[in-house]
């Protein structure tokens, strides 16, 4: 058993006495090609890449919202929420093709942007401004979530983040579809997120 980030608790989904088996894969990399988040410095640029939906996190809350508000989304919108988690291998492959070595990557899972970025930034932080998430079904769900809690539960339309040197930002924006600058690294702990225009 390899227990780690992909060991999920799913209250209300997996009944008692049932064991769910899941598959996973492990990648490998030459040591010389590994990236080191300890190299991040103020001024480094956060590039956010679009998510396809809520991906694999926040579903206990989503199910509760749907149970309490069964007509909040129609069947087609519900199916759109079930898009598989995007894996962002295209972004990583393009970064290598463009000779961009990011300082760090973050897959935005449970805990949203704040938790997934704060865990490796140490004494640094950022004030992030993300685009409005143009996903009708997701927005209907989010109307039932506390405005601040949404940032700490969901990916809010940004499923992957690369932190790059300022001189690499233009190339990094071309890596995979959906890249956008969402902020820069600063001194001082804490990730604060707002939606552009709110």
Model-derived features with residue positions:
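Glycine-/charge-enriched secondary-structure boundary and capping motifs
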Residues: 14-19, 69-82, 86-198
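Glycine-rich anion-binding loops of enzyme active sites
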Residues: 1-59, 184, 196
């Amino acid at each position: 058993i390899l227990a780690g980030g992909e060991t999920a608790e799913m209250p209300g989904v997996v009944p008692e006495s049932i064991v769910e088996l899941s598959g996973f894969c492990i990648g490998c990399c030459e040591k010389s090609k590994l990236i080191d988040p300890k190299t991040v410095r103020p001024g480094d640029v956060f590039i956010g890449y679009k998510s396809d939906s809520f991906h694999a996190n926040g579903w206990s809350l989503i199910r509760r919202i749907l149970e309490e508000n069964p007509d909040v989304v129609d069947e087609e919108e519900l199916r759109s929420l079930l898009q598989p988690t995007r894996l962002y291998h295209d972004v990583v492959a393009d970064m290598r093709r463009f000779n961009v070595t990011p300082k760090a990557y973050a897959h935005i899972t449970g805990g949203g942007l704040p938790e997934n970025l704060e865990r490796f930034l140490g004494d640094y932080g950022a004030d992030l401004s993300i685009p409005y998430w143009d996903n009708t079904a997701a927005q209907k769900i989010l109307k039932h979530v506390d405005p601040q809690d949404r940032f700490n539960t969901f990916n809010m339309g940004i499923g992957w983040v690369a932190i790059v040197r300022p001189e690499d930002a233009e190339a990094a924006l071309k890596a995979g579809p959906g890249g956008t600058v969402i902020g820069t690294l600063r001194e001082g702990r804490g990730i604060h997120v707002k939606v552009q225009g709110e």
